[in-house]
Amino acid sequence: TIYSDDSVYEMEEVVKDGIKKEIKELCFTDHVDYGIKRDVDDPLGPVYLNGQPITNVDYPKYYKEYLHVKEKYKDQITLKLGLEFGIQVHTINQYEALFKAYPFDFIILSIHQVDDLEFWTGDYQKGRTEEEYYTRYYQELYDVVKNYKNYSVLGHMDLMKRYDDHDGYDSFNKHKDIITDILKIVIKDGKGIEINTSSVRYKLDDLMPSKDILKLYLELGGTIITISSDSHQEDHLGAYIEDTKKQLKALGFKQYCTYNKMIPEFHNL
């Protein structure tokens, strides 16, 4: 929503559009990226990008508006409170504090930066081979899931493929050992993974995470999976979710999950 720096979608508009599209349940997961952004009330002030101030979500406002729309539209749609935590090892403590501050239903754990370098700008990849930047990315993800436990699902696990050289690099087989180790921790901790339908929007030739990762997750005993349209504007809202359910079923999954107060609720595919 408007509370993230990559969207201008008003929270109430999201809700109205969701009702219009006959979506039964919506969860807000605006972005938080400590390390490269500061909080609204940080005494150091905002970080500037291209002359524009960028901050994390204004949590008190976000929570207040969420409570308002949840009550206002309660007879038409179920709303859930979440955030997407863009964690790095050195920012874990800030997320521990944030998690305790609000009664979240759902938290996506994602890696959007490594060493405070952004993927989408190419800063992180600069001067590294694909082998190097994938290795470092998965190592960061491994270190984070080993040390941080207050989350629901792992977001777009192979996100790097959105920003790699698009030359057919086989990231799954080259990094299968650490991907396996990450998934084992996720499963042991009772967490899940997110399947992110924006892969269609970005014209990627596979699901996100890939079918290989999804099959491996299933083989390892993983059952918790959520489906997200990663919407930043109206035409993204709920996009490709039904199609993704069919693909999950074809891979052998029986159920998908939604969350309530950080507890997964299972629904048949």
Regions found by a protein language model. Name each.
Residues 1-85, 89, 98-101, 163, ...:
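An N-terminally biased module of ancient metal coordination in phosphate/nucleic-acid-related enzymes
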Residues 1, 8-16, 37, 115, ...:
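Charged catalytic cores and adjacent phosphate/nucleic-acid-binding surfaces used
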Residues 20, 65-76, 96-108, 145-149, ...:
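Acidic (Asp/Glu)-rich catalytic clusters
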Residues 26-28, 79-83, 107-109, 153-155, ...:
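Hydrophobic faces of well-ordered beta-strands that scaffold small-molecule active sites
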Residues 114-154:
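Hydrophobic, well-structured mid-protein blocks that either form specific transmembrane helices
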Residues 33-57, 108-128, 192:
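Active-site gating loops and adjacent loop-to-helix segments of metal-dependent hydrolytic enzymes
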